[in-house]
Design a protein with these regions (language model features):
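N-terminal accessory segments that target, anchor, or regulate ATP-driven/P-loop NTPase machines
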Residues: 1-52, 113
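Conserved ASCE/P-loop NTPase catalytic core
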Residues: 34-640
Length: 640
């Protein structure tokens, strides 16, 4: 299919269809979605969730406490927002059931750059997917059911067409009232159209932004008299009115109010009756205008607190359904957000060295977390991401303990994703000769930006501490492993050999038995075994070798039982993995001839160096980054 025919087909599928009122009522009998409310249609567009049994995934089970969570494919691009999205869907579900939420404003409250606007845009896109029915010509897209009275007509409509009475709760607009008089009460003359909500054409979807106190009035919401028509109609005539307000255009759909509490309070008054009574007054002496849609608003915390603290606004506050949209607090999800942003830019194919996005995500997440008591914030960040720190940080608490201590406002402060993406833009363009990003440039750019942003002294020191105390030292360790891994061709096999030998020697040492090497026949007594074990333990600074050896041997014996008698991999036990890596890489001098970019003494050294660079490139670095990061690592190690 060509792009032209594809476009034409898509355009044709959204064009309005016309029915008689009788045909519409017959359709109601067959299909309940014909008279569905805006909330019901949004639920249809969102679709059914995927139920995730977190108990089956060790990481998710720690994050969500083994609960079954709902994930909606419609929101798959919104990472780390399960709780927030679940609350939004709950609001629509309750509103669709005709509960109190139907009369409330859905209000997204969160910090700048936290995703409120993106959520609002997504909801507007979703509501465009499901059509609704309106009386042809109605300037406020009102439902044909608005012609009927629940008390007078409800029983007949329910019996003949299966329409529940709760759907007959809207009034007629002044425009319909005038047409009805013209038709002499013959409602069969009304035609019904099937419409698709449209952001572009403002059909069932509208957006309002705050204006200046002096130049914005309620006409932005309710419309105003069209002065061009005053030659033909009196001022209070329904046909002289311009139904251009956001409430008019969003009837049977969704109205978004951006930064709602920045608007003058007088502008917000029509929202009170629109939510509670399903109608609002015009600016002229017309009858009330119906509204049967969703009101969606969002703003930052500072405006909300100012508004809430004013006692005059209590009636309004009672009509608000708050959904908090905090910053993402999981590093892995923050990385997915950066990946999404990069994918939608020209940097999608630019080189990004390993650990760059992770380091930036760790920094931004650390800035959003509240400092825990009796535990370090870096461990808290790792626990929030679902890591198990039982073997590496005994002081680390459970995710629930951290959350309880932090309170409900965690994630409402800190650095935004916008800030992070601007940092990323600078890092990718840092080198004038290569569009690429790496953690060394990231550390430099972050430090410069922290100085330039003019944060409060306490915040500035806190952010610099994150860089110097947590991120830089861990990156030195990370890039060291990357370099050393590329240096050692048989890295995995070598590590497994050390692991197997350590477990074997430790087992014999614990049992106080001599060990005879089956290949050489050499006998190692308990003293000799201890010396061999210490060669592995000392570089890692193991303070209590006896307990450590017992712990490792017990772990391996349990693992063998589930692995057909074979040893587990050397990576399977965090504590011993760290010990083995430190043993393997304790001698940096061995690396120097291979990883340095100086002239080589021999062809053999040059070949080893070339092989090292090739393996680093295979791991995701550019040639230029290999040189930069290797030289940076050697400088840092030398200074230490």
């Amino acid at each position: 299919m060509s792009i032209f025919s594809h476009f034409q087909q898509r355009f044709a599928s959204t064009q309005q269809e016309e029915l008689t009122l009788q045909e519409y009522l017959e359709l109601c009998k067959q299909d309940r979605s014909t008279y569905a409310s805006a909330a019901e249609r949004l639920l249809l567009a969102i679709g059914e969730p995927e139920l995730v049994e977190t108990a089956n995934n060790s990481r998710l089970s720690r994050i969500f406490s083994n609960k079954v969570i709902r994930r909606y494919p419609a929101f798959e691009d919104f990472h780390g927002m399960e709780e927030c999205i679940d609350q939004i869907v709950s609001y629509f579900r309750h509103a669709a059931q005709g509960l109190e939420e139907k009369k409330q404003i859905l209000y997204l409250l969160g910090p700048v750059g936290g995703g409120k606007s993106s959520l609002a845009e997504k909801l507007k896109q979703l509501i465009e997917k499901v059509p609704f029915y309106a009386i042809k010509g109605s300037p406020v897209f009102e439902s044909p059911l608005g012609l009927f009275n629940a008390t007078e007509d409800g029983a007949i409509l329910e019996e003949d067409f299966g329409i529940p009475r709760r759907y007959l709760n809207t009034i007629m607009s002044p425009w319909i009232t005038k047409r009805l008089a013209e038709f002499g009460g013959d409602i069969s003359q009304f035609r019904v159209v099937k419409l698709y909500p449209s952001i572009l054409n403002q059909i069932g979807v509208a957006k309002t932004e705050p204006g200046d106190e002096n130049n914005q009035d309620i006409s932005a919401l309710v419309g105003k008299v069209d002065i061009r028509k005053l030659e033909e109609f009196p001022q209070n005539d329904a046909d002289a009115y311009s139904y251009s307000g956001a409430l008019c255009r969003a009837n049977q759909g969704l109205m978004e109010f951006v930064e709602m509490f920045k608007a003058p309070i007088k502008v917000l008054h029509p929202l009170l009756t629109a939510t509670q009574e399903g109608n609002y007054n015009s600016t002229e002496g017309l009858g009330a205008i119906p509204f049967n849609g969703i009101l969606l608003a969002h703003s930052n915390e500072s405006e909300w607190h100012t508004f809430r603290n004013n006692k005059n606004n209590e009636a309004f506050i009672d009509r608000i359904y708050i959904v908090k949209v905090p910053y993402c607090l999981r590093v892995s999800d923050e990385i997915k957000i950066y990946d999404k942003l990069l994918f939608n830019s020209s940097l999608a194919k630019a080189h990004c060295a390993p650990d760059t996005l992770k380091m930036l995500a760790q920094f931004t997440v650390l800035s959003r977390l509240k400092e825990p008591e009796n535990s370090n914030i870096y461990s808290k960040m790792r626990v929030y991401d679902g890591e198990n720190l039982k073997d590496t940080d005994p002081k680390a608490k459970s995710i629930q303990e951290y959350r309880d201590t932090a309170g409900v406002d965690e994630g409402m402060n800190g650095l935004s994703t916008r800030f992070a993406f601007k940092i990323l833009s600078k890092v990718f363009n840092f080198d004038p000769h290569e569009i690429a990003a790496n953690p060394v440039h990231l550390l430099y750019v972050l430090e410069q930006q922290i100085e330039q942003e003019q944060f409060q002294a306490e915040t500035r020191e806190r952010y610099l501490r994150f860089l110097k105390e947590y991120l830089a030292p861990r990156y030195i360790e990370f890039i060291g492993k990357e370099i050393q891994t590329a240096y050692l061709e048989s890295y995995s096999e070598y590590g497994q050999n050390i692991f197997d030998r350590y477990v074997l020697y430790a087992d014999f040492w614990i049992q106080d038995q001599e060990y005879r090497d089956p290949e050489t026949g050499e006998i190692l007594n308990r003293v000799a075994l201890n010396e061999e074990l210490e060669k592995i333990e000392k570089p890692a600074g193991i303070s209590n070798p006896k307990d450590f050896r017992n712990e490792i041997v017990n772990f391996v014996l349990r693992a063998r039982a589930n692995n057909n008698g074979k040893n587990p991999t050397w990576l399977s036990y965090e504590k011993l993995r760290v010990v083995i890596e430190k043993k393997m890489f304790s001698n940096t001098e061995d690396l120097l001839p291979v990883i340095s970019f100086n002239a080589k003494a021999s062809k053999e050294d040059q070949q080893k160096h070339n092989d090292f660079v090739t393996r680093m490139v295979e791991r995701g670095y550019t040639d230029k980054q290999v040189r930069l990061l290797s030289e940076w690592y050697l400088r840092v190690r030398k200074s230490q």
